[in-house]
A protein has these predicted regions:
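Rossmann-like flavin
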Residues: 1-33, 48-49, 56, 62
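C-terminal helical cap and adjacent loop that interface with cofactors, partners, or active-site loops
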Residues: 2-5, 389, 393
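Patatin-like phospholipase A catalytic core
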Residues: 3-23, 76, 81-82, 298-310, ...
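C-terminal segments that line or cap access tunnels to active or ligand-binding sites in enzymes
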Residues: 35-65, 101-104, 108, 132-140, ...
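Short, conserved active-site loop motifs that form the nucleotide-linked donor/cofactor pocket
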Residues: 72-73, 369
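A recognition module on extended beta-rich or small alphabeta surfaces enriched in W/G with H and D/E
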Residues: 102-133
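Short, glycine/acidic-rich hinge or "gate" loops at secondary-structure transitions
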Residues: 76-77, 404-413
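A conserved short coil-to-beta-strand element within the FAD-binding core of flavoproteins
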Residues: 76-103, 135, 139-143
Length: 413
């Protein structure tokens, strides 16, 4: 086997940390790891690209606008709760949906985007003024994306095969399958094997806004390319300087940042078969755990990245931008912390001997069901944008019944 020095080298650690391969499933399937490393050397243009705005604004808003212009109908605030099969267990027969909110009278369709400095952006909360229940959602601080929300749905719908759909393209991530696809799992050994063997993990992240720029924080290589660094101490083993996004944000001149730091890492997950969505405090408990992790990181560990932000007394909290001008660690309340524990938010791992259990887009075992996403057998077997794009193309190929090559789904040699 490899020596301890090799196992703890930057390259090996980077490969494991990049796909959050830690906790109880700290393995990385050897063939996939080797192929991914080789594919990384096959990049086009650059090894990685920096988005010029948030991912929702750079990727999903344009996707939405293009699809909208092409006639796709969107139904927002509709949550899939169950995928039902026909009596023969061969087709998806019904899709049960919870209607979380409805549009105000006179509004024909929900417009999800709002303008920030001329850029169509996704908001962090619903645009309440368009919703009949908008004021109640706002007053109660409801997060409709949370599976633990106490919110009472506005209604229900059941989509019926032959009336509402013919083909189903299932793009909801694997983490939600134990919740919404119980009938599929019970009817198919292949689905049961996929759900049991393709593991997931929750993730945690922070975004910090600093008054000083990168040089002021003490990073010694500030004159070079803004850093994307890793691996480092878990769980926050990576750091991306995203200060180029400041121009996309709206800050008062008297209280604006000069540096933005992003980091993310794994978090202990819940067993999907034991989820109890009646515990409405679960998201707060998870977020408190993230806050504790960030507080720990901003102690001694952060000194390596931001030496000038630390003194003998500890982290210099007054360097964090805070419009409320809080004291000490209270300034963390004005930063962005996130615990990704919702079933669809769980990251897909590439544990040893797991890829063989992934299903291809058109080999679900059900005649009218296709699946897509970075969690299927798309040829990459790694949770990433590239895998999701390849899977989307594979699904389109299956729907169109065409035969065309998709770059990345197969080895080039």
């Amino acid at each position: 086997g490899a020596s301890r020095i090799t196992l703890n080298s930057a390259m090996i650690r980077f490969m494991y940390d990049l796909i959050f391969s830690v906790h109880g499933y700290s393995t990385y399937e050897a063939g996939v790891a080797l192929r991914t490393a080789m594919r990384a050397a096959d990049y086009k243009g650059a090894y990685s690209f920096r988005m010029q705005a948030g991912m929702g604004d750079t990727i999903f808003a344009p996707f939405y606008e293009v699809l909208k212009k092409r006639g796709v109908r969107f139904e927002f605030f509709h949550k899939v709760e169950n995928i039902g099969l026909d009596a023969a267990k061969k087709n998806v027969e019904t899709i049960e949906i919870a209607v979380q909110a409805t549009l105000k009278q006179g509004i024909a369709e929900y417009n999800p985007l709002f303008d920030v400095k001329g850029l169509p952006c996704w908001p962090s909360t619903p645009l309440y003024e368009q919703l009949e229940q908008g004021q109640a959602l706002k007053d109660q601080g409801i997060n409709l994306e949370s599976y633990w929300t106490p919110w009472q749905n506005a209604g229900r719908k059941t989509l019926q095969r032959g009336r509402d759909f013919d083909i189903v393209i299932q793009g909801i991530p694997l983490g939600a399958m134990p919740v919404i696809a119980k009938e599929l799992i019970a009817a198919s050994a292949a689905w049961q094997n996929m759900v049991e063997n393709v593991k997931t993990t929750g993730t945690q992240a922070f975004q910090l806004w600093f008054y000083p720029d990168l040089a002021g924080l003490g990073w010694p290589f500030w004159m070079e390319e803004p850093p994307i660094a890793g691996p480092y101490l878990r769980p926050f083993g990576n750091w991306a300087d995203m200060s180029d996004l400041i121009t996309r944000e709206s800050w008062p001149d008297s209280n604006s940042p000069n540096n933005i730091a992003y980091s993310c890492g794994p978090i202990e997950q819940l067993n999907p078969y034991d989820w109890n969505f009646k515990d409405h405090n679960a998201p707060r408990t998870a977020l408190d755990a993230v806050r504790k992790s960030v507080l720990n990181f901003l102690g001694a560990p952060s000194q390596f990245w931001w030496p000038a932000a630390n003194t003998e007394a500890g982290f210099s909290w007054d360097l964090l931008v805070d419009e409320k001008n809080g004291n000490g660690a209270a300034r963390l309340d004005s930063q962005y912390l996130r615990a990704n524990i919702n079933p669809p938010d769980l990251y897909i791992l590439t544990a040893k001997d797991s890829s063989k259990y992934r299903l291809k887009t058109d080999q679900t075992g059900f005649e009218n069901l296709l699946i897509t996403g970075d969690w299927i057998d798309n040829g990459m077997f790694v949770g990433c944008v590239e895998g999701a794009v390849i899977a989307g193309k594979q699904t389109a190929r299956a729907v169109l019944k065409q035969d065309f090559e998709i770059f990345g789904e197969k080895d080039r040699i």
